[in-house]
C-alpha cells in the first residue's frame, strides 16, 4: 500500500534488461516485475524471482501477460489476478442481458428470476435496470417485497416476488452470491463457471500484451475506469448450458402456476399503491 492506495502488480516480459520497479500503464501506477518469455526451467526460475519481488512489496494482485504459463508460481507467493467480483456485480444487469441474448430470450417475453440469499446493492441495481424492459421479472430474496414495492413506486414496474422456498419457474434464474441453484437454466453470477469478457476504450497496445479482462478489473479497482466506461463483450455459460436438472411436466406446471400467482399478487399490490397515491 502506498499513500492509502493499494499497489497492484504488473507482470512484464524482460526483453532488453528492464528492471523491476514502478510503471504507469493506462493512467495507473503499477509495481512492475519482469520475467523471461517462454517456458522451461529458466523461465520458471525467472517467474519465481518476479513473484518474490511482488510478495516482498506486499502486492496481492497483478495483471499477467496473455496466456502466461506461470501464474501458478505467483499464486504460491500470494499474488493473484485482480478480483473480478466487484466489476461483475457492477455490470450484473448488462451481463444478464448478454446471457439472455446468447440464449435467445427476448426481454418482452422471457421470465427472469433474480435470486439472492440477502438484499444487496448489486441485486437492487440489476432489478432496477432490468425492470425497464424485462416484462416478467421476479425477485426471490428475503424482503424482496420491499424492493418490488420500491420499483413499483419509482419506476411503475410490475416486479413479482417469490418466496425462497417456492419452486422457481423461469426461463433464466440469475443467482447472486451463494443462493442454492434452482432447477432449469441458471446463470450463477458469482461463479467462475461463467466467463465474462469486458471491453473499454483507450487501452492501446496494452490489450494485446496483457490479459485484457485482468487489466480492466485492475483499472476499475484503481478508479481509473468507471463502470459506465466498461462494457460487457460476451458471456459464456457453463459447458452444460446452465441446466441444473430436468423438471417433470407436473413440477414444471406447478412452478409456472407459482410464477403466475406471484404476478397476480404484484398486480394487486400495484393497484393498491395506485389507489393510495
Named regions from a protein language model:
Residues 1-27:
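N-terminal basic/disordered segments at the start of proteins
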Amino acid at each position: 500500500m502506498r499513500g492509502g492506495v493499494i499497489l497492484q502488480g504488473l507482470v512484464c516480459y524482460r526483453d532488453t534488461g528492464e528492471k523491476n520497479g514502478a510503471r504507469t500503464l493506462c493512467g495507473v501506477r503499477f509495481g512492475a516485475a519482469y520475467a523471461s518469455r517462454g517456458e522451461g526451467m529458466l523461465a520458471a526460475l525467472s517467474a519465481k524471482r518476479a513473484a518474490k519481488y511482488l510478495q516482498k512489496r506486499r502486492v496481492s494482485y497483478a495483471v499477467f501477460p496473455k496466456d502466461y504459463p506461470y501464474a501458478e508460481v505467483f499464486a504460491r507467493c500470494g499474488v493473484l489476478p485482480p478480483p473480478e467480483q466487484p466489476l461483475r456485480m457492477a455490470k450484473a444487469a448488462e451481463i444478464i442481458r448478454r446471457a439472455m441474448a446468447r440464449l435467445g430470450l427476448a426481454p418482452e417475453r422471457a421470465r427472469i428470476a433474480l435470486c439472492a440469499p440477502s438484499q444487496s446493492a448489486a441485486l437492487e441495481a440489476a432489478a432496477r435496470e432490468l425492470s425497464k424492459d424485462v416484462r416478467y421479472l421476479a425477485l426471490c430474496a428475503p424482503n424482496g417485497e420491499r424492493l418490488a414495492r420500491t420499483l413499483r413506486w419509482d419506476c411503475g414496474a410490475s416486479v413479482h416476488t417469490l418466496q425462497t422456498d417456492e419452486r422457481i419457474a423461469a426461463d433464466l434464474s440469475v443467482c447472486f452470491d451463494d443462493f442454492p441453484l434452482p432447477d432449469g437454466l441458471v446463470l450463477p453470477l458469482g461463479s467462475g463457471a461463467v466467463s465474462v469478457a469486458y471491453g473499454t476504450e483507450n487501452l492501446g497496445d496494452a490489450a494485446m500484451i496483457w490479459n485484457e479482462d485482468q487489466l480492466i478489473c485492475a483499472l476499475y479497482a484503481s478508479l481509473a475506469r468507471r463502470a459506465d466506461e466498461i462494457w460487457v463483450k460476451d458471456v459464456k455459460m457453463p459447458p452444460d448450458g446452465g441446466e441444473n436438472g430436468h423438471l417433470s411436466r407436473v413440477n414444471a406446471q406447478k412452478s409456472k402456476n407459482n410464477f403466475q400467482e406471484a404476478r397476480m399478487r404484484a398486480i394487486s399490490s400495484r393497484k393498491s399503491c395506485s389507489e393510495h397515491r
